[in-house]
Amino acid sequence: MWRRADIRVRIRPKLSAGIFFSQQSRWEGRSMFRLHKWYLDVVTDTGDALILYAGTVECGRIAFDYASVLQYRDGVNRDVQSVRRVAQPRLQADAVTWCSGPLRVEGQWIRDAQEIQRTLVNGPDGLINWTCHMPRAQATVQLHGERIAGLGYVESLTLNIPPSKLPFRTLQWGRHLSDRHWLVWIGWAGCGDRRWIWMDGEEQPAAALVDCAPSRLNGGARLRLSSPRDVRDRNVLEALTGVPATMTRRIAGSLAGMHEHKQVSRSSLVIADHAIDQGWALHEVVTR
């Protein structure tokens, strides 16, 4: 494993609460916490996975940018992060590009499926807006001079709900991509069960999550996961390396019990025990 962590912190001007909220967007009118996060990935034909994150965290008057790269190849995980000179991905028509000098990564995702947008939460504790910019894409990434190509996925998330008030005890998320089909799912449990599942651009209101995979899809299909490999299995607090100490103290308590388990699996859509495609799924379970 190789890791780097550099720090770039921004301090807001100190304003009274009334002035602060009057100058902020609707996101910050309810909370002093805000997160905007990009998630991008690519999985090769052989199941090697590359996951990239970029975003901004704001907590009170403290704000910082961050980016990280998680690579799984041949059973080995490599994790590198930076919170200095962080560039955000650029969305232009049917392409997303991202380049990070500190991380030595440059990538492009070309759209192969239409965007999905949902407001997952809009309540007294705040908002969660989710946009799946590219449920399936043709992705090419250069990492430390190595070319990695395959089917990829791009989403972004914006929320202003503090970690202690997230509306779930267990979160399930995943995406399955093949040359013929794609599938995206989000499921919450523990604080009011919710789920959102799409297959090939159509929402699946009758579908369910069974053993962490979508079932009861249109046409009687279900997703079969096999040969899972751990990409990340850790307490979320371990991700705070390099985060400003002031920020860490503010959010560490609410993250103390949060755990993430991310896997890459061989995956197939199955109808009546017959596989109609074959691809790769990235999926995770987060508990708190």
Where are these regions (language model features)?
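Targeting-peptide/extracellular-domain and disordered-appendage signature
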Residues: 1-288
